[in-house]
């Protein structure tokens, strides 16, 4: 039995509201309290009074003063705000078009129902800078004896930080590891920019289901290719090092005539070797923890000795071990640094096997 516990899906642990009983996007928005609207507004600059400067306040141009500061309109500068509570969300460009929460997701209504997709969770980051809705797809793929379920994560940002995104998200069932669905991160998404034509570009739910089914087939082929690639423990140790070390650190490690022994000394946290290579204790702890998860993680014994097992050591570390929680965990796994490392790990698993 593994000493590790599963941390659940990226959107677990108090994030969002469960919406599995909802049929339409409108019901989802209402139940998750996301049924508010966003508008665009002009911005003003706050500047202190200047003894030698222009302190004239021209109210006809929208200027005003307050507590020792002058406020003037910023030309061609815009922000977004929630209309229900008048809370600012972010700064956006002139051509940015607001896409309301309901408009971003209601196209998927015809794909929800029995033998179709099911809404799972809906919620927000911050006060609404980004909102998300997840849906479980009626598509399960097999990797050897492993089952991998497939989800879609819809997100809509209101702070100008990202497009409307539809992210394909495979989850390994036994351990709830989040996996990457493609070698290129960009191939894991359908992206729609906040422009005049955004709503027209949103496809029907039936089209998204067809795209998801095709995507799941290619993902299954990708994972099964990893499953038949053999890797020894020494090769996995090297793989995890190559994933985490910088090029400079790799070069210093290569200076050892007996690299294999030097690698084992690193994994034993030998101070002299770590100092020579220039690797920090924090980074070495991450490397060792990844290898320990490879050896004893949830569902790892069944896939040890393969590139599939090596890759899942990395995804399992970020899904179940790394010190991430709540909104920070979800953001990192789906969109941020953890996702980027896991994507590099997927590519490296193939490169190391060649």
Feature names for model-found ranges:
Residues 84, 113, 158-160:
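Short, solvent-exposed coil/turn segments at beta-strand boundaries
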Residues 91, 130-134, 257-260, 270:
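Long, C-terminal folded domains that constitute the functional core of proteins
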Residues 69-95:
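A short, surface-exposed helix-loop junction/capping segment
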Residues 55-75:
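An N-terminal amphipathic alpha-helical segment
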Residues 120-140:
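Beta-rich nucleic-acid/ligand-interaction surfaces
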Residues 1-59, 123, 140-354:
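Intrinsically disordered, low-complexity regions enriched in serine/threonine
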Residues 94-118:
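Amphipathic alpha-helical segments
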Residues 99-107, 126, 130-132, 149:
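Short, well-structured alpha-helical interface segments that form or flank functional binding sites
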């Amino acid at each position: 039995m593994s000493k590790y516990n599963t941390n659940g899906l990226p959107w677990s642990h108090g994030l969002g509201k469960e919406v599995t009983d909802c049929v339409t996007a409108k019901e989802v928005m209402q139940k998750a309290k996301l049924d508010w609207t966003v508008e665009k507004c002009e911005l003003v600059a706050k500047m202190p009074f200047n003894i030698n400067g222009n302190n004239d306040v021209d109210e006809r141009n929208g200027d005003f003063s307050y507590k020792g500061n002058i406020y003037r309109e910023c030309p061609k500068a815009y922000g977004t705000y929630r209309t229900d509570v008048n809370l600012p969300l972010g700064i956006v460009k002139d051509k940015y078009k607001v896409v309301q929460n309901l408009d971003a997701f209601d196209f998927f209504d015809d794909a929800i129902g029995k033998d179709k997709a099911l809404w799972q969770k809906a919620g927000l980051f911050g006060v609404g800078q980004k909102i998300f809705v997840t849906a479980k797809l009626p598509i399960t793929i097999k990797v050897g004896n492993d089952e991998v379920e497939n989800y879609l994560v819809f997100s809509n940002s209101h702070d100008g930080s990202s497009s409307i995104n539809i992210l394909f998200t495979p989850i390994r069932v036994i351990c709830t590891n989040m996996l990457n669905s493609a070698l290129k991160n960009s191939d894991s998404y359908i992206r729609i920019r906040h422009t005049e034509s955004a709503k027209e570009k949103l496809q029907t739910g039936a089209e998204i289901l067809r795209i998801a089914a095709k995507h799941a087939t290619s993902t299954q082929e990708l994972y099964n290719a990893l499953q038949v690639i053999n890797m020894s423990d020494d090769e996995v140790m090297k793989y995890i090092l190559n994933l985490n070390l910088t090029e400079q650190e790799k070069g210093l490690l290569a200076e050892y005539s007996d690299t294999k022994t030097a690698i084992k000394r690193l994994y034993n946290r030998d101070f002299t070797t770590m100092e020579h290579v220039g690797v920090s204790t924090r980074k070495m702890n991450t490397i060792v923890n990844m290898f320990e998860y490879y050896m004893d993680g949830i569902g790892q014994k069944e896939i040890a000795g393969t590139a599939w097992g090596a890759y899942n050591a990395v995804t399992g570390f970020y899904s179940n071990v790394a010190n991430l929680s709540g909104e920070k965990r979800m953001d990192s796994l789906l969109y941020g640094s953890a996702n980027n490392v896991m994507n590099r790990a997927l590519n490296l698993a193939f490169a190391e096997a060649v």
